[in-house]
């Protein structure tokens, strides 16, 4: 009795599945460790002369230091724990939803201070602004929403093209997007927050 021979297409599909599985397994085993600069954040340097005119660099006022933007770990909690600062996620609608972190700061050139010139400071919110204004997007959605201009503005290009080709879903998609925008369900695609107008 002979075994039935499966069709060639099934054999090729099974071979591709095995190849994909082995390549995914091998890529997981070939990760390289991430190296971060060694920064001593726990111990403050001892001042050389406590009666001298120099203050610790970490005590300088805001106008004499420049600080980096919060580090984006893109959801990697391990990297955040190793570095001991940075943001796992950006943005949020309410204050409780927004993470806070310390940022790396440096004393400006020409400022004399005691101790390390690079230090961690502050409790900065993990928020980024990329030029999206709520009122502008709301006006786009109200007047030009049937052409998908609001979705193009927010960076949702795929759905914007669909909205454009269907004329806003014959008005239904236009109305739904207007409600989503007002209730906070439609945000910029890069997870940034709305810019505030002062």
Curated annotation (Swiss-Prot):
State the annotated membrane topology for this chain: Multi-pass membrane protein
What's the protein here called?
TM2 domain-containing protein 2
Q: Which intervals lie on the Cytoplasmic side per UniProt?
A: 150-166
Secretion signal span: 1-27
**Highest lineage ranks of the organism?**
Eukaryota, Metazoa, Chordata, Craniata, Vertebrata
Has the keyword Signal been applied to this entry? yes
**Organism superkingdom:** Eukaryota
| Keywords from the named record | Glycoprotein, Membrane, Signal, Transmembrane, Transmembrane helix
Cellular localization per UniProt: Membrane
| Chief location category | membrane
Pfam families per UniProt: TM2
Instruction: List, alphabetically, the GO terms of the cellular component aspect.
Output: membrane
Residues in domain TM2? 131-179
Gene name, per UniProt, is tm2d2
Question: Which family, according to UniProt?
Answer: Belongs to the TM2 family.
Native organism is Xenopus laevis
């Amino acid at each position: 009795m002979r075994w039935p021979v499966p069709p060639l297409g099934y054999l090729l599909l099974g071979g591709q599945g095995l190849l994909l599985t082995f390549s995914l397994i091998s890529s997981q085993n070939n990760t390289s460790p991430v190296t971060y600069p060694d920064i001593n954040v726990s111990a403050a340097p001892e001042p050389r002369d406590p009666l001298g005119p120099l203050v610790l660099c970490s005590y300088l006022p805001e106008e004499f230091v420049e600080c980096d933007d919060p580090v984006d770990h893109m959801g990697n909690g391990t990297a955040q724990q190793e570095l001991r600062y940075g943001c796992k996620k950006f943005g949020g609608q309410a204050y409780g939803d927004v993470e806070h972190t310390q940022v790396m700061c440096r004393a400006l050139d020409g400022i004399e201070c005691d101790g390390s010139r690079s230090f961690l400071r502050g409790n900065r919110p993990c928020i980024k602004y990329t030029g999206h204004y709520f009122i502008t997007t709301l006006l786009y959605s109200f007047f030009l929403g049937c052409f998908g201009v609001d979705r193009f503005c927010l960076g949702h290009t795929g759905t914007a093209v669909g909205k454009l080709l269907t004329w806003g879903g014959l008005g239904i998609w236009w109305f739904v997007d207007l409600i989503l925008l007002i209730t906070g369900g439609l945000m910029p695609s890069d997870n940034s927050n709305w810019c505030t107008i002062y």
